[in-house]
Curated annotation (Swiss-Prot):
GO molecular function: electron transfer activity; FMN binding; heme binding; metal ion binding; oxidoreductase activity, acting on diphenols and related substances as donors
Subcellular location as annotated: Cell inner membrane
Organism expressing this protein natively: Pseudomonas aeruginosa (strain UCBPP-PA14)
One annotated Gene Ontology cellular component of this protein: plasma membrane
Protein name: Protein-methionine-sulfoxide reductase heme-binding subunit MsrQ
Pfam families, per the entry: Ferric_reduct
Keyword match Iron-sulfur: no
Comment on bound cofactor: Binds 1 FMN per subunit.
Cofactor(s) listed: FMN; heme b
Keywords, ordered alphabetically: Cell inner membrane, Cell membrane, Electron transport, Flavoprotein, FMN, Heme, Iron, Membrane, Metal-binding, Transmembrane, Transmembrane helix, Transport
Phylogenetic classification of the source organism: Bacteria, Pseudomonadati, Pseudomonadota, Gammaproteobacteria, Pseudomonadales
Protein encoded by which gene: msrQ
Transmembrane segments: 8-28, 42-62, 75-95, 110-130, 147-167, 169-189
Amino acid sequence: MRYWYLRLAVFLGALAVPAWWLYQAWIFALGPDPGKTLVDRLGLGALVLLLLTLAMTPLQKLSGWPGWIAVRRQLGLWCFTYVLLHLSAYCVFILGLDWGQLGIELSKRPYIIVGMLGFVCLFLLAITSNRFAMRKLGSRWKKLHRLVYLILGLGLLHMLWVVRADLEEWTLYAVVGASLMLLRLPSIARRLPRLRTRPGVS
């Protein structure tokens, strides 16, 4: 398998982060509300993984190195895993598995609805991220996977609604996300491979 070392590094890194958070929770190092801290960190981790997934194509075009594309799907699946853990942690630590409380939460915190929409879209991408689905869906596969752009927008909106007044960190992620979207505009995307082939550029 090509780039196995890169795939292994992504696997170990993505696995180590939540494992470390769980260890911190075990030793009471996550503050007075470790459950909420875990929910927040898993959500932020999912957003970071989504941005990394979207960064792979521009990086490949700029560098010409195919290794970036080799881990793109893996990063996307880890993003889904983090979202699933984020949702599970919310149900356990915030709701306390009290499903009757969910209706109240939805009415008081509509950002949860935004997050759920993003989860449903990401679920569709996760279950179709395989060769069988690509063959079965044909040209519709690419159209379906453009949902990733909607997912990014929903993720940023979800985070904005959660942080509210503390916009400094959110702005950073929003700028990175907007930049990655700009790099996908046809007029810009066509120029990326040329940047590495210009005289004087190594």
